[in-house]
Amino acid sequence: QIILLGRSSFHVLMIRTWNERIEYLVKANNYLDCIALGTDFYTDQGKAVVGLKGSKEKKKSVIGNKMLSVLLKYLNVCMSKNFPQEGNMTVLKEYFATIVPPCVNLCLTLKRKDVLFDQVWNAFQVDPFAKATFLECLESFILSDQLRNVPVSITQEFVKHYEITERYMALEACVTHLNVPSLDIHQVMNVCWTHGLYDAIIYIYNNGMLDFVTPAEELFAILIQAMDSSGFNESQHINNGYESVTKRLTSSQIKLGNKLLVYISCCLAGRAYPYGDIANDQVKRVKTDVYACLTALHSKKAAEDELVYPYLRTLLTFDTQGLLNV
């Protein structure tokens, strides 16, 4: 403390304890600064922290419990007292864009996913703008692998929201970073097949069913149909090379063919698709199964006039050099 002597009195100045500093901001209805300050205390980045005793773990526990109580108060305040009384769509979007991310970030900093997916979710899902902002906040944490396990009821809303807003690329990326038990597989597969999110389809087959052959067969069927529909044949490819592919197929069909090449290459190299590694005890089986699929004499649902080695023929016709590199 500091004592200042004046002409007619003296003044005592004291540094507030960490708890008093938190309470001061709460009483001033300045919850965002309060959450930021509490986060600094918790991550050991706060300045002039007074009043905390014990081990580092004990301090974190005390601060964490305090900030959770602050968070629950804030959830009530921001959806009632602080809620814009007269606001259009833009005002509401800006309001929730300001208040939702700090709440999500605090829960993850405190490692309290239970609170995030219970009290915080329940508070924000009642308003469509708050709900949308909450779901979009999850994206960065999913992609950074901080959130791999999410309740299925919430991922269902996440998938629905991203499909409605046509954020297909972001949705596909997020699906491949979530553990499969977090997903409603029927819902996700329907969305992925509808919009051609092949990475996510492969990921679910590989990680949810340990099936590395079916996705290849399904994607081969689509590519073969596309090449047949375009009037593409092997002699044209021999005469014109890869350029003949780009002229006759759409960009999405070419992308599919390239994905197939990369997927097969990953499987034969013991690498997971689209990232990571295949479990050691699965590598040999995956290599054998995928190689057998690639060199199959006929496809799974072969027509009577199907030529032999349809999958090899398809990739050789699509991109000879690419297949040889594989």
Name each model-derived stretch.
Residues 1-326:
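Extended non-globular scaffold/tether segments
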